[in-house]
C-alpha cells in the first residue's frame, strides 16, 4: 500500500479513537517515507509516550528528528532507544542506533 493510502487509513483510525503505539508508529513511518519528517516526529513522539519500551519507535523518531534538522532531538531519541533495546535484549536495534548516535555525535560535538 502506498504511503498516502496508509496515512489516510491510519488517520481515519486515529479519528475514530483507535489511538495506540503501533498505530502512531505506522503513521510516523508513513509520513517519514513521504518526506514529511515534522509530521513523523509528532506521531513517533506519541508512539514513544504510549510505549516507551518500543525500541523501533525510538529508532524511527531519531531518524525523523535528524531529517527535520533537529540533531539534538535525534541524539536524545537514539539514547532512549538504546536503553529500550537493551532492556528488551534487542541487540540488533541497539547496534543500529549506536552507529547512528555515534555519527550524529561526531557531527555535533558537545551533545553529551
Q: Could you tell me what each predicted segment is?
A:
Residues 16, 50, 67, 84-88:
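Structural marker of alpha-solenoid helical repeat scaffolds
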Amino acid at each position: 500500500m502506498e504511503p498516502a493510502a496508509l496515512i489516510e487509513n491510519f488517520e481515519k483510525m486515529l479519528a475514530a479513537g483507535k489511538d495506540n503505539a503501533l498505530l502512531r508508529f505506522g503513521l510516523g513511518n508513513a509520513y517519514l517515507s513521504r518526506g514529511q519528517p515534522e509530521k513523523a516526529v509528532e506521531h513517533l513522539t506519541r508512539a514513544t509516550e504510549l510505549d516507551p519500551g518500543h525500541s523501533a519507535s525510538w529508532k524511527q523518531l531519531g531518524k525523523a528528528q535528524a531529517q527535520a534538522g533537529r540533531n539534538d532531538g535525534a541524539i536524545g531519541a537514539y539514547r532512549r532507544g538504546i536503553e529500550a533495546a537493551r532492556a528488551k535484549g534487542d541487540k540488533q536495534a541497539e547496534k543500529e542506533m549506536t552507529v547512528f548516535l555515534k555519527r550524529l555525535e561526531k557531527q555535533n560535538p558537545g551533545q553529551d
